[in-house]
Swiss-Prot record:
Expression steadily increases from the bottom to the top of the plant. PROSITE patterns: SAM_OMT_I. Pathway: Aromatic compound metabolism; phenylpropanoid biosynthesis. Belongs to the class I-like SAM-binding methyltransferase superfamily. Cation-dependent O-methyltransferase family. CCoAMT subfamily. Induction: By wounding and viral infection. It catalyses: (E)-caffeoyl-CoA + S-adenosyl-L-methionine = (E)-feruloyl-CoA + S-adenosyl-L-homocysteine + H(+). S-adenosyl-L-methionine binds at T56, E78, G80, V81, S86, D104, A133, D158. Its EC number is 2.1.1.104. Substrate binds at K14, D156, N187. GO terms for biological process: lignin biosynthetic process; methylation. Its cofactor is Mg(2+). Keywords: Lignin biosynthesis, Magnesium, Metal-binding, Methyltransferase, S-adenosyl-L-methionine, Transferase. This is Caffeoyl-CoA O-methyltransferase 5.
Length: 240
């Protein structure tokens, strides 16, 4: 039971905080007042989409935007775009000559946010590729000139391929660079008992997320930090 009598009825709630009121306080006090107008517009447009649960939360968008500025990221990659909220957060953070290689299997969703991204004046930073990411990653890895060239890589896509992505992008991110894996607390399901009520998609991907978390914790090539922001994000800093 959460504060004020609020109870999450099932695993699959967007906020990991036990108090909806506390999460709303964070949004209204810290996030929404400082949210760029373009990100607000895209967030509101995305909220009308039937698959709006796929979007990056506003607090995570704020976090990513600041993180990219702190590490002075310039060459970045995003696997899984949806309507482009996190992509826009990235594009606004990196310098004018920065680049984002963005990949998603559905261009139609990306085009929902594209007019807003264009209006924000950052579309020139984005190279969008429609289709599965693994073939593109294999091609990049094959050319050793691409090794260690990315400052930041954000993964928010098919959870059953996260480990396959990690095997490839670990070579592409520079030593000292960051990889961010989204949804690593997966609606809180990572600590839920097997018989807990879960939405079908949450239950399906749960074991893949658990497998990823164990693999990242055991990978000596990275330092990690798992944060309860949004639906959980694990930051991996490459050290070798």
């Amino acid at each position: 039971m959460a504060e004020n009598g609020i109870k999450h009825q099932e695993v699959g709630h967007k906020s990991l905080l036990q108090s909806d009121a506390l999460y709303q306080y964070i949004l209204e006090t810290s996030v929404y007042p400082r949210e760029p107008e373009s990100m607000k517009e895209l967030r509101e447009v995305t909220a009308k989409h039937p698959w709006n649960l796929m979007t990056t939360s506003a607090d995570e968008g704020q976090f990513l935007n600041m993180l990219l500025k702190l590490i002075n990221a310039k060459n970045t990659m995003e696997i899984g775009v949806y309507t482009g909220y996190s992509l826009l957060a990235t594009a606004l953070a990196i310098p004018d000559d920065g680049k984002i290689l963005a990949m998603d299997i559905n261009r139609e969703n990306y085009e929902i946010g594209l007019p807003i991204i264009e209006k924000a004046g950052v579309a020139h930073k984005i190279e969008f590729r429609e289709g599965p990411a693994l073939p593109v990653l294999d091609q990049l890895v094959e050319d050793k000139k691409n090794h260690g060239t990315y400052d930041f890589i954000f993964v928010d896509a098919d959870k059953d391929n996260y480990i396959n992505y990690h095997k490839r992008i670990i070579d592409l991110v520079k030593v000292g660079g960051l990889i961010g894996y989204d949804n690593t607390l997966w609606n809180g399901s990572v600590v839920a008992p097997p018989d807990a009520p879960m939405r079908k998609y949450v239950r399906y991907y749960r074991d893949f997320v658990l497998e990823l978390n164990k693999a990242l914790a055991a990978d000596p090539r990275i330092e990690i930090c798992m944060l309860p922001v949004g639906d959980g994000i694990t930051l991996c800093r490459r050290i070798t």
